[in-house]
Amino acid sequence: PWLQECSNRVIESGDLVAFDTDMVGPYGYCADISRTFVEGGKFSDEQRRLYSLATEHIQHNKELIKTGTSFREFAEKSWVLPDNCYHNHYPCMIHGIGLCDEWPFIAYPNKDFSNADFSGHFEENMTICVETYIGEVGGKEGVKLEDQYRVTSNGLEQLSSFPLEQLT
């Protein structure tokens, strides 16, 4: 559902189009955001539902991030993907960002947390990306969102400025 190459298919009105834009920015630092748009600007009810789940996922997880919070505690409290979306999840909920995608890499935990290393904690001035892909197994569409932040002593400073779609 994600990480697909382009084809010769013409994008039509009502199609979802997602961009994951890893870019080298000023002084060689990486900028990384993901957005999903609908061609023609009008979301279907199903697209709106998926987009709402994706924004809820990002909002919930970013509110958990505080200086000193362990990656394990974050993973334990993180937003739980719906069962019908779990096997389509993106490889991580959070990754570091600097000159490229970097540590930490916080995966979606399995039930006993044996699938990844959750040692470490959020530190002041870490730059991270909080991301999600919401798409049902067997579904035709999905929503990919990602924002970039700096961890501060007072919470998060959002580094990405491109707004999320306003669903009406």
Language model features: what each stretch is:
Residues 1-168:
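Active-site neighborhoods and metal-handling regions in enzymes and metal-associated proteins
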